[in-house]
């Protein structure tokens, strides 16, 4: 019986990790003018993530813009390496601003 309960707990942890993996890749996106600006442009949607202006959303939950808009609490930075941090919402971070 101990073996059965440990197997069922393993399978439940596997199914929960699948859902987290599915949400992990959700926010990766490329900005249309990233080539012209030498990179650092992109956007993402989600909840409570970090967005780095290298066109990669590390958590699938970006919520920032170059001016710090589009998130609660929402902080953003638009410089050559646009990046930001936010709560829920949507926005973009771009190094071209």
Curated annotation (Swiss-Prot):
Record-level GO BP terms: sorocarp development
- Region listing for Disordered, in residue ranges: 1-22, 62-97
> What InterPro entries does the database record attribute to this sequence?
HssA/B-like_chaperone (IPR050533), HssA/B-related (IPR008455)
- A Pfam family reported for this protein in Swiss-Prot or TrEMBL: Coiled
Which stretches does UniProt call biased (Gly residues)?
Answer: 85-97
In which residue ranges is the amino acid composition biased (Basic residues)? 72-84
Reading the lineage from the top rank, the first entry is Eukaryota
Stated family: Belongs to the hssA/B family.
The protein's name is HssA/B-like protein 44
Q: Which organism is it from?
A: Dictyostelium discoideum
């Amino acid at each position: 019986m101990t073996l059965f309960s440990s197997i069922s707990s393993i399978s439940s942890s596997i199914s929960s990790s699948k859902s987290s993996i599915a949400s992990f890749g959700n926010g990766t996106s490329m900005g249309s003018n990233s080539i012209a600006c030498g990179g650092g442009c992109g956007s993402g949607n989600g909840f409570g993530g970090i967005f780095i202006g290298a066109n990669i959303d590390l958590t699938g939950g970006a919520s920032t813009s170059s001016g710090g808009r589009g998130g609660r609490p929402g902080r953003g930075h638009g410089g050559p390496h646009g990046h930001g941090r936010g709560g829920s919402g949507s926005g973009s971070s771009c190094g071209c601003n």
